[in-house]
Amino acid sequence: MFPMVTGFINYGQQTIRAARYIGQSFMITLSHANRLPVTIQYPYEKLITSERFRGRIHFEFDKCIACEVCVRACPIDLPVVDWKLETDIRKKRLLNYSIDFGICIFCGNCVEYCPTNCLSMTEEYELSTYDRHELNYNQIALGRLPISITDDYTIRTILNSPQTKEKACD
């Protein structure tokens, strides 16, 4: 008879423990009810990137001295720098500069080690194309600045919403 009583006691303890665990998880679920949604509706809303986000590389042709430090700093030797030595002034003249973003790993070493700061990382992350050859950007395509995400109308609306302002005050 005692084994049957201890079996009922164990069953009762396990039932109480399971009810407590269910109650705890339900309280956690209810605590998330007052929070703002984290998911963004991607094609209609854009992700606000962090300050140090490593997106597409921006290149300023006039600042480049064709030193090829970016090529040596790149772990995959990606930037293609074509230059010509001007014998009369004994300096290199940059002819072409290109980066293939289909191969780039966006490590940012080229930007970090550039002595003239002609390279910078932008907040542009929408680089998808149907043809991989379109991901090879020359100096003209690299020189275009993207539209800032914070200038987008939908992002400004989200940032100016009362819910976001209340969250910032807390």
UniProtKB/Swiss-Prot annotation:
Pfam families: Fer4_7 (PF12838). It catalyses: a plastoquinone + NADH + (n+1) H(+)(in) = a plastoquinol + NAD(+) + n H(+)(out); a plastoquinone + NADPH + (n+1) H(+)(in) = a plastoquinol + NADP(+) + n H(+)(out). Its main location: plastid. The keyword 4Fe-4S applies. Its EC number is 7.1.1.-. It is an enzyme of class 7 (translocase). Signal peptide: none annotated. Keywords: 4Fe-4S, Chloroplast, Iron, Iron-sulfur, Membrane, Metal-binding, NAD, NADP, Plastid, Plastoquinone, Quinone, Repeat, Thylakoid, Translocase. It is a peripheral membrane protein. GO terms for biological process: photosynthesis, light reaction. Residues 55-84, 95-124 form the 4Fe-4S ferredoxin-type domain. Its cofactor is [4Fe-4S] cluster. Gene3D superfamilies: 3.30.70.3270. One of its GO terms (molecular function) is 4 iron, 4 sulfur cluster binding. [4Fe-4S] cluster 2 binds at C74, C104, C107, C110. GO terms for cellular component: chloroplast thylakoid membrane. It is found in: Plastid, Chloroplast thylakoid membrane. Binds 2 [4Fe-4S] clusters per subunit. [4Fe-4S] cluster 1 binds at C64, C67, C70, C114. NDH is composed of at least 16 different subunits, 5 of which are encoded in the nucleus. HAMAP family: NDH1_NuoI (MF_01351). PANTHER family: NAD(P)H-QUINONE OXIDOREDUCTASE SUBUNIT I, CHLOROPLASTIC. NDH shuttles electrons from NAD(P)H:plastoquinone, via FMN and iron-sulfur (Fe-S) centers, to quinones in the photosynthetic chain and possibly in a chloroplast respiratory chain. The immediate electron acceptor for the enzyme in this species is believed to be plastoquinone. Couples the redox reaction to proton translocation, and thus conserves the redox energy in a proton gradient. Belongs to the complex I 23 kDa subunit family. This is NAD(P)H-quinone oxidoreductase subunit I, chloroplastic. It comes from Spinacia oleracea (Spinach).
